[in-house]
A protein has these predicted regions:
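N-terminal Rossmann-like or analogous alpha/beta NTP/dinucleotide-binding catalytic cores
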Residues: 69-154
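N-terminal catalytic cores of NTP/NDP-binding nucleotidyl/phosphoryl-transfer enzymes
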Residues: 28-56, 61-66
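Short, aromatic/basic amphipathic alpha-helical patches
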Residues: 166-175
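Positively charged, low-complexity intrinsically disordered leader regions
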Residues: 5-23
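Short, flexible loop segments at boundaries between secondary-structure elements
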Residues: 153-167
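Short, solvent-exposed loop/turn segments at secondary-structure junctions
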Residues: 37-38, 67-69, 135-137, 161-163
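Conserved small/polar residues in nucleotide/adenosyl-binding loops
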Residues: 176-183
Length: 184
């Protein structure tokens, strides 16, 4: 950690604040779990855990999407607030999970390739791993500018026994998970 002193002139007085900033001395491996999380469920949390453990990730960021392009109607601000709070409550007991609101704007569409490009610009020394479920994987070619996503991160795709991803091997890393309680 690095401590930096900040001197501020406020009115006639001068205040000194100490700001603690985390200085990254090494590359971090960050997993990205995007989605509507409507609602977030145990499958999302288990997928985050599997990715964290199996690929030696440092953190998993959950990004609730406020206005996904594949949805017909826009969320209200109130509905988005509820989804954010559900995610916050679901991940709060796991110190490796954090909430990121980069895609939470309900007034415009957010696209994964733009979000990942943005993260790479802000954190150029970090490695990003975009985590997908099997259903999203098989619709991946329908995503806007999906090929650009491959240049910004490694794709971790969760597979179920009944799915075949052989056509996409070489572009993605498969994340084999145990059956979730939802699959039973």
């Amino acid at each position: 950690y690095m401590i930096r002193k900040l001197n501020l002139n406020i009115g006639n007085s001068q205040s000194v604040f100490s700001i603690v900033e985390k200085e990254r001395v090494q590359t971090m491996k960050i997993g990205i779990m995007g989605g509507t999380f409507e609602p977030i469920h145990i499958g999302h949390l288990l997928l985050g855990e599997f990715a964290y453990e199996d690929f030696g990730l440092d953190e998993i960021w959950f990004l609730p999407n406020g206005n996904p392009p594949h949805k017909e109607t826009l969320d209200t601000e109130e509905a988005m607030h509820h989804r954010i709070e559900m995610v916050r409550l679901a991940i709060k007991s796991n110190p490796n999970f954090s909430l990121n609101l980069s895609e939470a704007d309900t007034k415009k569409h957010s696209y994964t390739y733009q979000t990942m490009r943005h993260f790479n610009e802000i954190y150029p020394n970090d490695e990003f791993y975009f985590i997908l479920g099997a259903d999203s994987l098989f619709a991946f070619e329908e995503w806007k500018d999906f090929r650009k996503i491959f240049t910004t991160c490694t794709i971790l795709a969760a597979m179920r026994d009944d799915k075949d991803a052989s056509a996409m091997k070489g572009q993605i890393c498969l994340l084999y998970t145990s059956p979730s309680p939802r699959d039973s």
